[in-house]
Curated annotation (Swiss-Prot):
Superkingdom of origin organism: Bacteria
Molecular function (Gene Ontology), one example: 16S rRNA (guanine(1207)-N(2))-methyltransferase activity
EC number: 2.1.1.172
Similarity-based family: Belongs to the methyltransferase superfamily. RsmC family.
Source organism per UniProt: Pseudoalteromonas atlantica (strain T6c / ATCC BAA-1087)
Keywords: Cytoplasm, Methyltransferase, rRNA processing, S-adenosyl-L-methionine, Transferase
Methyltransferase as UniProt keyword: yes
InterPro entries: Mtase_sm_N, rRNA_ssu_MeTfrase_C, RsmC/RlmG, SAM-dependent_MTases_sf, Small_mtfrase_dom
Gene: rsmC
Name of this chain's protein: Ribosomal RNA small subunit methyltransferase C
Task performed by this protein: Specifically methylates the guanine in position 1207 of 16S rRNA in the 30S particle.
Quaternary structure and interacting proteins, as annotated: Monomer.
Length: 343
């Protein structure tokens, strides 16, 4: 079933029937098959929807006109674009700056999203690019706005949106590159710092920073033990980009892999570290972390370990007890718990 935002978009499908269009971060991959125009391309920053879109296109016998990237190539030239509004305002602003640079003069911008996700602010987000912004639909607790790009458009450079911050935990100093839309943008969040404070030892084997965000844990581990073989993974193209940049800034050699959960990862790990997500967009979603905990034992070496930090209210301890022989609480505060689990 299509997401509510995609259902609202399809109510105005006639707007997309002509010309070359770009769908930006659609919330499901099947919307492309529901559109009659074959000249609809996908710009994806989330690997799960990217994979879903590719699979759907192949099943329909369509060309796979999809890219999983942090920023879309502005050499492209589209008649229109549809932005599925992201949760973070700054992320939406960055995406719009990228998208308008991909449009032909006088191109059309559509922004669709849920009421709870801040879609009512879309008109303000569009005003830097258009004097002609209109709300054209409202249904299924969503809304859609349309604008014609009639103001001058600047070139887009993702590096201008980057934030580089410096941090020190224990005796290790490190730099972090982050972008809007990446977890804890521009900051070292309290939970991650608590996890870092409780990493006594990093082994010289293969280690994983799961749901790596800006790559903080992976870079810290690589600096703590330069002999470690660091792997970082995330579902977000922005996180992949930032983790690669963070690794470069710190001189850490790391393999950074886009993955929906553990699906794209091969081989086994001696240590796994994570501050796992519990949101998908604006919705609370425990499925990613629960799936990770259930599958991880197949990716851990004998006597391998997991160190995980989580908000105390998430109650992950019971699931960890089911999946691991040994579960130890390393430390806890009023907000967070850090667990060490072994096969």
């Amino acid at each position: 079933m299509l997401s509510a935002a995609s259902q609202v978009l399809l109510r105005s499908e006639e707007l997309l029937e002509q010309g070359k269009w770009l769908l930006v971060n659609p919330t499901d991959g099947h919307v492309f098959s529901a559109l009659s125009n074959p000249e609809v391309y996908g710009f994806h920053q989330f690997f799960d929807i990217y994979e879903q879109s590719i699979a759907s296109a192949k099943a329909q016998g369509r060309d796979t006109q999809h890219q999983f990237v942090a920023a879309y190539d502005t050499d492209a030239s589209f008649d229109g674009a549809v932005l599925y509004l992201p949760k973070a305002k700054a992320h939406g602003q960055m995406l719009l700056a990228n998208i308008v640079a991909c449009l032909k003069p006088g191109g059309t911008l559509l922004v669709v999203g849920e009421n709870k996700g801040g879609i009512k602010s879309a008109a303000k987000l569009l005003t830097p690019y258009s004097d002609n912004v209109n709300k054209i639909d409202s249904a299924r607790h969503c809304a859609m706005f349309a604008a014609v790009v009639d103001k001058p458009v600047a070139s887009f450079d993702i590096t201008k949106w980057q934030d580089v911050s410096e941090h020190q935990v224990a005796d290790i100093s490190f730099k972090v590159c982050s972008l809007p839309g990446v977890f804890s943008h521009g900051e070292l969040d309290t939970g991650t710092q608590l996890l870092l404070d409780n990493i006594d030892r990093v082994v010289s084997g293969r280690i994983l920073d799961f749901a790596c965000g800006a790559g903080i844990i992976g870079c810290f581990a690589g600096l703590k033990n330069p002999q470690a073989q660091v792997v970082m993974s995330d579902v977000s193209a922005l996180a992949i980009y930032c983790s690669q940049k963070s690794a470069e800034l710190n001189g850490v050699k790391a393999q950074v892999i886009p993955s929906n959960g553990l699906g794209a990862l091969t081989g086994k790990f001696a240590q796994v570290f994570t501050n796992p997500p519990f949101h998908t967009g604006i919705k609370t979603d425990y499925s990613v972390t629960e799936g990770f905990m259930q599958q991880l034992k197949n990716h851990l070496q004998d006597r391998g370990s997991l160190i995980l930090v989580a908000n105390k209210f998430l109650r992950y301890a019971d699931e960890l007890d089911k999946q691991f022989k040994s579960v130890q609480t390393l430390t806890e505060t009023t907000k967070f718990s850090v667990y060490c689990c072994r096969r």
